[in-house]
Amino acid sequence: SALWGLSLTISMLVVAVISPFLGALADYSGRKKTLLFVMTAISIVFTGLLFLVEKGDIFIGMLFFIIAEIGYRSGQVFYNSLLVDVADKDEIAKVSGNGWAIGSVGGIVCLLVVLVLIQLNPGNPFYIRLSLVITAVFYALFAIPAFLWIKEQHRPQKRDGKSLFKVAIER
């Protein structure tokens, strides 16, 4: 559990450092939905790859988890930036809350599925590892509506000749 905490700390520190750049990228690129897709795909792929991690594969397990978590948390930057494209200013909180609620329902359903699977096969590490593939599949399925239904309004802000890095630092 200490190594899981360390992995989470590393991933959150990376996201804290890169978030200003990601925010600038969201605001100035006009590609929020594409960037959300990339980060979501990274998170899904590396969550699924955790299936390959077996007992004793500590480094690779931590690495896959860190990358999956960075993809997930970085994706939230782009998810949040899309709120202005799907809701009026007075509806943003409601739309955001509903989005999180739907995602949470998917997470709870997934948890129940893998919990039953693991309980029916106690002590079998294969089913514990398989739960990560199932989680990746649920994640992908529950992400599909966002990519199908969200209509991004390409409104990249002007950088006035500044690099994204400089814009991110100056904000």
Identify the meaning behind each predicted range:
Residues 4-24, 111:
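Central cavity-lining transmembrane alpha-helices of secondary-active solute carriers
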Residues 51-65, 121:
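Helix-loop junctions at membrane interfaces in 12-TM secondary transporters
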Residues 110-119, 136-156:
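C-terminal membrane-cytosol helix-exit motif in multi-pass small-molecule transporters
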